[in-house]
Structures are given as structure tokens and as C-alpha cells.
Amino acid sequence: VLSTLHTNDAVSSIVRLEDMGVETYLVANSLVGLVAQRLLRKVCPNCAKEVETTEQERLFLGEDVKTVRKGIGCSHCSNTGYKGRIAVHEILAMDNTIRRMIVNHDSVEAITAYAREHQHMRTLKESGLMLVKQGVTTPEELMKISYE
């Protein structure tokens, strides 16, 4: 298990390992999976209110997201609107196709596209968007960790 590779997503860890001098064949044959994770602050359940999304939020989240939950601040959350944290993950499971893609030096985008289509991998943004739609966290928190 390796941690803290300072990458924006799980797939970019492949390039990061190669940049650190790990031979491509070792990266391809040694990895079992890759996980990127971030912590998002959770909306305080005591002061959460349903609010309309702004134009900027709809551009980021999608036009279908008309309302979100946001904390207005209370004594339970020290007037921050947030209480607690939750992890969002991006998980890439290695398979023979991905191993070949690594050896062939396919792009991060190509590997990500393959994983999303064939493994149903969710990006950090997609995982976080689910939490925003469920009212667990806010668009602001998701924007902080999303590099898409």
C-alpha cells in the first residue's frame, strides 16, 4: 500500500509512479488497484436548509440540480454550516486491459474512459455529486476537490 502520491485522481497515480522512476512493466504488473480519496465537510443536520442553486453551481453540477442543502450556521456547528466529514473515493481495479494500456503508455484520459465504461468507475466528482444530490455535502465542498 502506497499513500500520499499527490495526484488529482486514481489513474494519475500510474504516471506519478513512472515519474518517480518505477519501470512501466513493474507498475503494470505490481498494482492490484488504485484509490484516490478526499474528505468533504458534511452539512450540519441541525441547521440545513434547502436552497436554490446558483447559475455557477448549475454549470458545475448539471442543470438538473435545482436545489441543494446548505447549513446556515448554528450553535451545533459553531456557525460554520458543517458538522463532520465524509470520504469520497475513486477506485480503479486493475485488469489485463488496463495493464496493457499502461505498458502501451496510453493516456490517463484513455485509461479513465475505459475504466468508466467497463468497470463503472466513478470519478471523485461523480462520487461527490451523488453526495451533493443527497444533501450530505455542498457544491462548494465538491468544487474544492474536483479537478475535472
Can you describe what each PLM-predicted range is?
Residues V1-E148:
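Short, flexible helix-loop junctions that flank or precede catalytic/ligand sites
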